[in-house]
Amino acid sequence: MRSPEPGRNALLDAGQRLLGTADLARISVNAIVAEAGMAKGSFYQHWPSRAEYLRALHIRFHDELVESIEAAMAELPPGHDRLEAAMNAYLDGCLAEPATKALLVQSRTEAGLTDLVAARNHSAATLMMPDLQALGWSSPEPIAALLVAAVAEIALVELDARQRDDELRRGLLRLASRTPTAD
């Protein structure tokens, strides 16, 4: 039996390419299969609906980012340097992917994706809590949630400018690294 992965990946790649130039809401099954050079029936062999396809696209995008973030953090102890490495890995990954804007912003309002967005944000906040604790935050949860939102905003600024904004990146790290007062 032939593996479904090549066709599935070709369809996901096609959607990711389309999202580099089009809004999430405007990506149709017909556009996806045309971009992939596949028949419409092949789409439905992998996903029962467009909504499930968008979930798979969102999951793959974030899984790839998480891989690079975890690799950047792997050898570093919790604290400033690890937080900076994670943030830079995320932002550099977003900047390199033209579909980022659709998968970061538009997915927040797309039916069927809001639970994934919330879960990814929570996961990202949880990942940085040891760093915030090492920086002196005794109650890091609200700070982590705010940092997740701020990093996503920096990603959008950088996408619009088509380049890194090291000043924003350093500014956010300064906020996270400030000496906390009683929480």
Where are these regions (language model features)?
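Basic, helix-initiating cap at the start of DNA-binding domains
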Residues: 1-22, 26-35, 52, 64
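Hydrophobic/aromatic residues within well-ordered alpha-helical segments
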Residues: 7, 50, 57, 61, ...
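Amphipathic alpha-helical segments enriched in hydrophobic/aromatic and basic residues
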Residues: 19, 28-29, 40, 50, ...
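Short hydrophobic/aromatic patch on the recognition helix
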Residues: 37-47
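Hydrophobic alpha-helical connector segments
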Residues: 56, 70-96, 144-147, 169
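Amphipathic alpha-helical packing segments from all-alpha helical-bundle domains
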Residues: 66, 85, 110-145, 170-173
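Amphipathic alpha-helical segments used for helix-helix packing
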Residues: 91-115, 156
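Hydrophobic alpha-helical segments that form the core
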Residues: 92-93, 138-160, 164-178
